[in-house]
A protein has these predicted regions:
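Conserved PLP-binding active-site segment in aminotransferase class I/II-type PLP enzymes
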Residues: 1-70, 74, 96
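PLP-dependent aminotransferase-like
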Residues: 69-123
Length: 123
């Protein structure tokens, strides 16, 4: 049996009608980037996160890349991450010329093991 890496239709089956309605609204407006619909989303996300700003981007990969850039990550830097993640995590780090430093996960939580972080820091 072939298992897909990402099964988008199955992941949003319950909200399909609402998603299609909103996609049609965006297409009808002719504003695929920026515009009032994106601004409204950004304001709602900022409010929900109790943040001053939120920026809509085209993908999770872009979100990771912009976050790393905002943090000042660049050539030769080391960024601690987990190998138990989507490949864009390490890819975004490497794209900026930085080095992903992998730390294993905790068996109980599947999150990065904080007890291993300090010994991986090199400077």
């Amino acid at each position: 049996m072939k298992t897909p890496l990402l099964d988008i239709p199955a992941s949003y089956k319950e909200i399909l009608a609402d998603v299609q309605k909103n996609i049609n609204q965006v297409i009808s407006s002719g504003q695929f980037i920026l515009g009032p619909i994106v601004e409204e989303l950004e304001q709602k996300v900022a409010t929900y996160c109790d943040a001053k700003y939120a920026v809509g981007v085209s993908s999770g990969t872009d979100a990771l890349l912009i976050s790393l850039m905002a943090a000042g990550v660049g050539e030769g830097d080391e960024v601690i991450t987990t190998p138990f993640t989507f490949f864009s995590t390490a890819g975004s780090i490497a794209r900026l010329g930085a080095l992903p430093v992998f730390i294993d996960i905790e068996k109980e939580t599947f999150n990065i093991d904080p007890n291993q972080i300090e010994k991986k820091i090199t400077n």
